[in-house]
Amino acid sequence: MKFETTKNKLHGNAYYQAQFQDPIKFTTGSATPASYNQFIDALRERLTGGLIYGIPVLRDPSTVEKPNQYVTVELSYSDTVSIQLGIDLTNAYVVAYRAGSESFFFRNAPASASTYLFTGTQQYSLPFDGNYDDLEKWAHQSRQRISLGLEALRQGIKFLRSGASDDEEIARTLIVIIQMVAEAARFRYVSKLVVISLSNRAAFQPDPSMLSLENTWEPLSRAVQHTVQDTFPQNVTLINVRQERVVVSSLSHPSVSALALMLFVCNPLNATQSPLLIRSVVEQSKICSSHYEPTVRIGGRDGLCVDVSDNAYNNGNPIILWKCKDQLEVNQLWTLKSDKTIRSKGKCLTTYGYAPGNYVMIYDCSSAVAEATYWDIWDNGTIINPKSGLVLSAESSSMGGTLTVQKNDYRMRQGWRTGNDTSPFVTSIAGFFKLCMEAHGNSMWLDVCDITKEEQQWAVYPDGSIRPVQNTNNCLTCEEHKQGATIVMMGCSNAWASQRWVFKSDGTIYNLYDDMVMDVKSSDPSLKQIILWPYTGNANQMWATLF
């Protein structure tokens, strides 16, 4: 069913710039993994309004003028057959598409969409909204049963360009296009699955992880922007490929690196922000609430938890590492207060002094030296005492070892993750094109991704270590602290800086101490070498967790 909408005549430079900005183009006829990556990167760049905690974020709707609210994407089947999509840059939603001299708008498209998109065409309203619930109802198929891939995209472009009025097929086709364009722009996980599909020349269906990410984009964006001391005020629950729950409680959780674009929710008061978020925009934007004081566990070395020794709260009792208990118990629960104290049962995590090696204890907050009770939790998993510049460290590898403060060397023993689920995050790690990290004895290299292979399963611990599920006593380790050092498997017992990694929002796996990233040597997987190398942004340094 088609309904012609009202077409408005527009004037002004703002309209001209928005309407006639070149569309971002992707040609399916000669598509390669590289050309698809270039397309998605260009779309992400066009949609990005700034960075919050280093993660690209869309524009604040309150700062966007209506004529500048939309971007266009051109998808080509051939030199003569193509369609265009209209995308709302405040939420990355597809709101309309153009097929020749006609254009079609979702029923729930913003009122301004038909005013500023495809104005030289005959405009029609589709009989359904652009959300998955409505699209699946009209398609008579769920997303998980609709195949994605290059051929599905090509046939979808050809079908929409034909002008056929089969609403069921239109809805099904739009489900394909929305996921391969908009969702891929939002999530590295999705774009990586498409790249693997292009490499294999094989169709794929959305897995539980992909669907889970699509369904939780807004809650995950909200949680990141409301982060307090690296901790989400509310957990976000994802589903992995094995249909298991993955509880995400902190900004440093590796699954957060799947986010390539966030929905704008609010500006964190103290977040590191990009210059793109200019002062006048930030001043107009909504500021996140800062009243959250989450109560969480703190997981660290070897997956053990920060614990008040013997559950004794007398002043001076040491803080130790202990096995995380099956139930949430008070001596392993810590409230992250807005005054920068970290409290268990109302008493403060306190450093005995400001020299390396001083032990950390529980102490009455009102009688302790205030500066000894203050801590900052960074988004790389570091917990630092601002007065001394020293960091919380687990020097002993044994359960029951007393925590101390030490010089910040970004060692594995100095890595932490907050949240009530501090268990290791189990995932495959996809890298250069269609290949995944695979463990072999003391070595690691890339092979064709197969989530059923145990060699491709990795456990990412709260301390920042990456361990093969086959043997979690081994850690991915750079052999030397220098450019070109090979990354191998070594025992985790030393908890070195060479064994601590951060999954960054730019798609890299980053070593904090060396300020370098994992790199497929010479972009040649046949060499079977992953090395440490300065950041270049090239495809051989891009990784994604496939959990």
UniProtKB/Swiss-Prot annotation:
Annotated catalysed reactions: Endohydrolysis of the N-glycosidic bond at one specific adenosine on the 28S rRNA
Signal peptide (residue range): 1-20
Annotated positions of the Pyrrolidone carboxylic acid modification: Q21
Domain Ricin B-type lectin intervals: 292-419, 422-546
Cysteines joined through disulfide linkages: C266-C288, C305-C324, C348-C365, C436-C449, C475-C492
Residues with attached carbohydrate: N380, N420
Molecular-function GO terms, alphabetical: carbohydrate binding; rRNA N-glycosylase activity; toxin activity
Ranges occupied by 1-beta repeats: 345-385
Assigned keywords, A-Z: Disulfide bond, Glycoprotein, Hydrolase, Lectin, Plant defense, Protein synthesis inhibitor, Pyrrolidone carboxylic acid, Repeat, Signal, Toxin
PROSITE patterns: RICIN_B_LECTIN, SHIGA_RICIN
EC number(s) on file: 3.2.2.22
Ranges occupied by 1-alpha repeats: 302-344
2-beta repeat spans: 472-511
Recorded domain comment: The B chain is composed of two domains, each domain consists of 3 homologous subdomains (alpha, beta, gamma).
Its biological purpose: The A chain is responsible for inhibiting protein synthesis through the catalytic inactivation of 60S ribosomal subunits by removing adenine from position 4,324 of 28S rRNA. Less toxic than abrin-a.
More about this protein: Induces cytokine production and proliferation of splenocytes and thymocytes in mice.
Protein family (similarity comment): In the N-terminal section; belongs to the ribosome-inactivating protein family. Type 2 RIP subfamily.
Subunit architecture: Heterotetramer of two A and two B chains.
Protein name per Swiss-Prot or TrEMBL: Agglutinin-1
Organism: Abrus precatorius
The organism's taxonomic lineage, starting at the top: Eukaryota, Viridiplantae, Streptophyta, Embryophyta, Tracheophyta
Gene giving rise to this polypeptide: AAG
